[in-house]
């Protein structure tokens, strides 16, 4: 099945890489500085920006709204609705209102992507999906997706009417965490769903001390983080949202899209970072263990 490419522009390697606003908007006193940071990311070449109503309690959306209101046609904006903000007695209405509030903060009349932030409260999924479908029909969102869903979650979600329109699934699929390669990635490919990774590369420093990763990076004159990201972007039907913490890191992450790993480099990385295809704990078992 053809992979959907929502939020993407015409340059494939650029299109596969987005900027996550996870660390934006926490403090109003930093809004000006963070606005400059986002403008710098745009100047580097980033065109996909992903927020959430929970990032800075809406602050990330506000910063993005100020920065990109005059550049709206040049960027792709997405946000996420949190299950914790959904009223169980008014699921549909809660999602619609949350979307409208995100649109207000983003200073736009539509989002390119709107995502369910996590898989809790699966009994509400049908109504959440109904809201997504109506928001899409009304032109308030261009596409919708899910986040932190494993293969079991996504399989259940896809049984719902209209779920075949799901465009993306966001996960923690990385070089250091390859479990999703066993089941979630094949499922996404079979359904034409784009798998987007949240590597949070700056948070995986221990993996970057690996001798094989460091050797490949040194041979190419780049950082281990760039090699790890290039590995991620080598997979068909996948993308990544990165979380830079400096302008230098922003540039380095964006430059990673130009790195084409050689077959022997991919083989060495795949051998070093094994793919543990173990039976997952079911959602029911996870809940029972809490």
Model-assigned labels for residue ranges:
Residues 103-122:
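Active-site groove signature of glycoside hydrolases
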Residues 28-41, 90-106, 152-156:
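Short, acidic/polar
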Residues 1-75:
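N-terminal binding-site loop/beta-alpha segment at the start of enzyme catalytic domains
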Residues 12-17, 45-48, 71-75, 108-112, ...:
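Short, well-ordered coil/turn segments that N-cap beta-strands
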Residues 25-30, 52-61, 84-89, 120-124, ...:
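Acidic-and-aromatic substrate-binding clefts and catalytic sites of carbohydrate-active enzymes
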Residues 119, 123-290:
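Beta/alpha (TIM)-barrel catalytic core signal, keyed to glycine-rich beta->alpha loops juxtaposed to Asp/Glu
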